[in-house]
Amino acid sequence: MGSMCIAMAPRTLLLLIGCQLALGFNEPLNVVSHLSDDWFLFGDSRSDCSYVENNGHPAFDWLDLPQELCHSGKISAKSGNSLFKSFHFTDWYNYTGEGDQVIFYEGVNFSPSHGFKCLAEGDNKRWMGNKARFYALVYKKMAYYRSLSFVNVSYSYGGKAKPTAICKDNTLTLNNPTFISKESNYVDYYYESDANFTLEGCDEFIVPLCVFNGHSRGSSSDPANKYYMDSQMYYNMDTGVFYGFNSTLDVGNTAQNPGLDLTCIYYALTPGNYKAVSLEYLLTIPSKAICLRKPKRFMPVQVVDSRWNNAKHSDNMTAVACQTPYCLFRNTSSGYNGSTHDVHHGGFHFRKLLSGLLYNVSCIAQQGAFFYNNVSSQWPVLGYGQCPTAANIEFIAPVCLYDPLPVILLGVLLGIAVLIIVFLLFYFMTDSGVRLHEA
């Protein structure tokens, strides 16, 4: 159909316009896809083929991922997990993958339905904010890097106090960052403490810097039973750069004054020697980091909406985190409705959305994927690849530069058509005048 439109364009501009507008040719597909075979997907149970194969779900009805991709080597997924959950907690999976075009379909396994709070009177909304900030940095950085993996971070602490698991609930225990207990020779938490850690082996490291966002009560060994304001920082000993912040809210961990919980900011740090410093309350040190390697030319990541069926409470933090130009968000117009296994897996519309992984496309854009690169009923917004209506599209942040040649050619054709029409009108008018004169 596209070849016919191009072949007929010199004969009539109207047919070309008809192909583009009236027929809606080459409309963007609401799928997640890729420009080449150099792609990778990070997922959870909806793309965890190993879980399906080991548990014998018939016809792979558990998955949203096309079954044909199960042994492609392009998937890193774990049932019941997510990048955020693995980054912060003891229940983790070693997500590892590499590709030019990176796709994320995970995140739902840490949501309001789990209701995680550090403390009894904590605030799950704080953790939703942490989740959004975490994914925002991951998405942005993976638009510039090929490889993502997890690494452990070792530290050196000069005191005698040991790590403490202060932040946990019935199912999850936080171990990133690591909390160092109060030294026994201090009667309260009003003292400065520090520890050294080294980041090496990656181009950049994503690490958390977290503080309790209010007034923290001291331990039972604190005779004054005081409240403390948390203050943490990281200091790059090679460059002299500080990263840090203090708690600012008037909240606590009591029924009368609830809301005390961890607020985390995420930094992409370069390799080097660092010092973690606490000016008051507990010293925290990163124990895990996301390792970013192999810089690449800019390529936006694609994120598929990760949510439960309406029977469970979901959040939209991955959508909040996925911002253009470095991230393109994919969603469906309907809720998640699972098929034969349960309501949370094997959703028809999400299977259709992920079916685009079975083939390459010419262009990915904000509206979706364009299969052809010649003409389209819609001009690609933030397009990347060989996009329709342009011979070449390159991203120079944040402006798309379109090749003007097709537009120039259309203008030339329009000019020629006008000249031909004028010539024919003049010819027939002259010919009619001659015939009338002869008659």
From Swiss-Prot:
GO biological process, alphabetically ordered: fusion of virus membrane with host plasma membrane
Segments in the Intravirion topological domain: 429-439
S-S bonds: C49-C70, C118-C167, C202-C291, C210-C264, C322-C327, C363-C387
Region: Esterase domain 2, residue numbers: 282-395
InterPro entries attached to this UniProt entry: Capsid_hemagglutn, HEMA, Hemagglutn-estrase_core, Hemagglutn-estrase_hemagglutn
Protein name per Swiss-Prot or TrEMBL: Hemagglutinin-esterase
Residue positions of the active site: S45 (nucleophile), D342 (charge relay system), H345 (charge relay system)
Source species: Puffinosis coronavirus
Protein EC: 3.1.1.53
Keyword list, A-Z: Disulfide bond, Glycoprotein, Hemagglutinin, Host cell membrane, Host membrane, Hydrolase, Membrane, Signal, Transmembrane, Transmembrane helix, Viral envelope protein, Virion
Catalytic activity: N-acetyl-9-O-acetylneuraminate + H2O = N-acetylneuraminate + acetate + H(+); N-acetyl-4-O-acetylneuraminate + H2O = N-acetylneuraminate + acetate + H(+)
Location of region: Receptor binding: 133-281
Lineage, highest ranks first: Viruses, Riboviria, Orthornavirae, Pisuviricota, Pisoniviricetes
Topology relative to the membrane: Single-pass type I membrane protein
Subcellular location as annotated: Virion membrane; Host cell membrane
